[in-house]
């Protein structure tokens, strides 16, 4: 079941990957967790459907900051 965060839905796809969608199901992108020597970080990637590719938005120390990129 998706988790709603201020009109954005997060669908957990795996231990370290979430799909970010609008409530109507339109996919905005993905957030992936990864390890660094300083601790876990979160990478936000916007999906460009017409170009069939992803564009990195940024890397963040807090998952909510990564999700905020899609608002």
Name each model feature, range by range.
Residues 28-53:
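Short aromatic-glycine-(Arg/Gly/Cys) micro-motifs in beta-strand/loop hairpins
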Residues 17, 27, 38, 64-67:
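A broad, structure-centric signal for solvent-exposed, well-ordered loop/edge residues
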Residues 49-71:
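A short, charged, amphipathic alpha-helix used as a generic interaction element across diverse proteins
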